[in-house]
Amino acid sequence: MDLSAAAALCLWLLSACRPRDGLEAAAVLRAAGAGPVRSPGGGGGGGGGGRTLAQAAGAAAVPAAAVPRARAARRAAGSGFRNGSVVPHHFMMSLYRSLAGRAPAGAAAVSASGHGRADTITGFTDQATQDESAAETGQSFLFDVSSLNDADEVVGAELRVLRRGSPESGPGSWTSPPLLLLSTCPGAARAPRLLYSRAAEPLVGQRWEAFDVADAMRRHRREPRPPRAFCLLLRAVAGPVPSPLALRRLGFGWPGGGGSAAEERAVLVVSSRTQRKESLFREIRAQARALGAALASEPLPDPGTGTASPRAVIGGRRRRRTALAGTRTAQGSGGGAGRGHGRRGRSRCSRKPLHVDFKELGWDDWIIAPLDYEAYHCEGLCDFPLRSHLEPTNHAIIQTLLNSMAPDAAPASCCVPARLSPISILYIDAANNVVYKQYEDMVVEACGCR
């Protein structure tokens, strides 16, 4: 099977399979690029220690060499996150620490206007290129917002542009402060619309100038065929008879509103609220599709390099899964002992630890934070009489009673999560935007019998 065929097969699997199978198909797709698959702990068995999501789902991490050149891994200083093509904007990192309740004491306050009703916050980095001739007329900002879901409600949008202090921007430099004018960009079929006008206050040091552009973003999305790019133009005027003023005289820089560093470029922060329940599997599938497109553009691997074929990878994973299932069956059955003996060796339904390590899953090239968390899981017997704290349903009570009287007549009720809570994740989406999103039902808070 050639590489493009393997990619097509895996993308079909991702569109049709269950989440567990989807995780495995994503791992196969990633492994199809190069290098043999290795298990999370470096060994081949399901050894001791606490269970992790990688072990529970049967997912395997792959070496960085298995990822196409466009997503070659590099480890950021002081962070476990790795991605060679995207540098997370410092504002999005600060936003995550603030909204996730992880801001350290004394950390700078983060503007949260419009974020209260949002469950998703996306940071779009400026993609415009500037030249010196544009410095006299203004500065344009260009954002590709095509990744926003049409069904999502935009509850807030803010343009943030870095401004540095300069001799001409300090106190006493002007008899009256210059005006900053923010408008939409002129186009072939539309005239520019003034969005914002305010005084450029004297500045010592540096700060991020923030402009509310929520109404402009909503109008952009209401267009019959909205363009992919959302374009804004910042200008300055000064004097009794307002005349154009070069923005760099007020401390604005180039390219992208601050400097050559990615974290200094202007950023459009869009807060939205989804109309559907978000599934982490949807983002995993999008990541795999984007990776599949990159894999299809890569040259075919040299057969002499020891690269594992997709067929060999699938076969190897199937053998490992079968061996693991056999081990669990032997452990759960007590090596062929009767049903009653196995039951006596198990505890009642309760919450047990389940540590999720995204690095172990190989997801640290798109998940920025957190890199691990405690998810918990439910395990144990639901036998008669059921305890009230397990919050059994009436159906579970009847089923458990029947099972206690005649085990062959009805199976025991199941120990499952009864209450779950969300976590917030900061990640890079398939369009290379940094996204803060709250995912429901990620942590087990209580278990019950159902």
Curated annotation (Swiss-Prot):
The keyword Glycoprotein applies. Transmembrane segments: none annotated. It is found in: Secreted. GO terms for cellular component: extracellular space. One of its GO terms (molecular function) is cytokine activity. It comes from the Eukaryota. May play an active role in the motor area of the primate neocortex. Belongs to the TGF-beta family. This is Growth/differentiation factor 7. It comes from Homo sapiens.
